UniProtKB/Swiss-Prot annotation:
Source organism, top-level taxon: Bacteria
Function: Catalyzes the deamination of adenosine to inosine at the wobble position 34 of tRNA(Arg2).
Subunit structure of this chain's protein: Homodimer.
Catalytic function, reaction form: adenosine(34) in tRNA + H2O + H(+) = inosine(34) in tRNA + NH4(+)
GO biological process: tRNA wobble adenosine to inosine editing
Reported cofactor(s): Zn(2+)
Classification of source organism: Bacteria, Pseudomonadati, Aquificota, Aquificia, Aquificales
Protein name, entry field: tRNA-specific adenosine deaminase
Gene that this sequence comes from: tadA
Cofactor binding description: Binds 1 zinc ion per subunit.
Family: Belongs to the cytidine and deoxycytidylate deaminase family.
Enzyme Commission number: 3.5.4.33
């Protein structure tokens, strides 16, 4: 099981968010090849602006592993993490994040800011952009429907 497999699992989570009228972002956390947690955006459902897929996946992984640090774990997410989520990755000490679409408005990894490579922080998170057209298409479809008041 490689990057593409795990990103497709995250994409299934993003589709669940889409079906609920949430911004379609899905995330999973993997440790030693095992999926530890899965989540999708739940901001609308939970009425919580911090209920991003990454934040929920981090919380669940910490709970399951009974730790506040996710050393040796990787996050696979369908959209570049925002600034809040990027800093949460630093705080969680996760090893690496792999994302499949860029976020030109709110990206906290490479598109707008680069939190993960900030030299003044105590932890560096490796990152990789691994494009999956299906992730970008799902986001485009969602925002098109939102603009046309279909969602």
């Amino acid at each position: 099981m490689g990057k593409e497999y795990f990103l497709k699992v995250a994409l299934r989570e993003a589709k669940r968010a889409f079906e609920k009228g949430e911004v379609p972002v899905g995330a999973i956390i993997v440790k030693e090849g095992e999926i530890i947690s899965k989540a999708h955006n739940s901001v609308e459902e939970l009425k919580d602006p911090t209920a991003h897929a990454e934040m929920l996946a981090i919380k669940e992984a910490c709970r399951r592993l009974n730790t506040k640090y996710l050393e040796g774990c990787e996050l696979y997410v369908t959209l570049e993490p925002c600034i809040m989520c990027s800093y949460a990755l630093v705080l969680s000490r996760i090893e690496k994040v792999i994302f499949s679409a860029l976020d030109k408005k709110h990206g906290g990894v490479v598109s707008v800011f680069n939190i993960l490579d900030e030299p003044t922080l105590n932890h560096r998170v490796k990152w990789e952009y691994y494009p999956l057209e299906e992730a970008s298409e799902l986001l485009s479809e969602f925002f098109k429907k939102l603009r046309n008041n279909i969602i």
